[in-house]
Swiss-Prot record:
The gene is TCTP. GO terms for molecular function: calcium ion binding. Keywords: Calcium, Cytoplasm. GO terms for cellular component: cytoplasm. The lineage of its organism: Eukaryota, Viridiplantae, Streptophyta, Embryophyta, Tracheophyta. Pfam families: TCTP (PF00838). Involved in calcium binding and microtubule stabilization. PROSITE patterns: TCTP_1 (PS01002), TCTP_2 (PS01003), TCTP_3 (PS51797). It is found in: Cytoplasm. Residues 1-168 form the TCTP domain. This is Translationally-controlled tumor protein homolog. Transmembrane segments: none annotated. Belongs to the TCTP family.
Length: 168
């Protein structure tokens, strides 16, 4: 199994269990998320409330919860939405920090295409949700999510050059 860690924070953000599609000349990865139901586990502890005079079962109120698989699996933390100014400021800092970690062809491809990828994200800004890794590192990569028109499940966007492949 391959896990993809954020090169800046070390947080696990994705794995090969979630197939991706390349966008913007490979600078962005697009990954489909899915809503899944968690919880509502029926546990039989062997008690017999009717024999003990209890009419109602006073068990734990275990509610089923819907979560997005990627968010839950990698413990992503949702962040407040960015306005255009905040987004551009964040991207400038991210590009600078990530460029320092890249070299050779990776750096060339990233620098050549990151502007178009940023414009692509900027065009969707009002529809984006923002997530960071579990550590909530200030300079870590941001994972973007949005809903395609008519879709019930979110689509996630990652900066491919910001991910480090690790074998588990």
């Amino acid at each position: 199994m391959l896990v993809y860690q954020d090169k800046l924070s070390g947080d696990e953000l994705l794995s090969d269990s979630f197939p991706y599609r390349e966008l913007e000349n490979g600078v962005l990865w697009e990954v489909d998320g899915h809503w899944v139901v968690q919880g509502a586990v029926d546990v039989d502890i062997g008690a017999n409330p009717s024999a003990e005079g209890g009419g109602d079962d006073e068990g734990v109120d275990d509610q089923a919860v819907k979560v997005v698989d990627i968010v839950d699996t990698f413990r992503l933390q949702e962040q407040p939405a960015f306005d255009k100014k905040q987004f551009i400021s964040h991207m400038k800092r991210y590009i600078k920090n990530l460029s320092a970690k890249l070299e050779g062809d990776d750096l060339d491809v990233f620098k050549k295409n990151v502007e178009s990828a940023t414009k692509y994200l900027l065009s969707k800004l009002k529809d984006l949700q923002f997530f960071v890794g579990e550590s909530m590192h200030d300079d870590g990569g941001v994972v973007f999510a949005y809903y395609k028109e008519g879709a019930a499940d979110p689509t996630f966007l990652y900066f491919a050059h910001g991910l480090k492949e690790v074998k588990c």
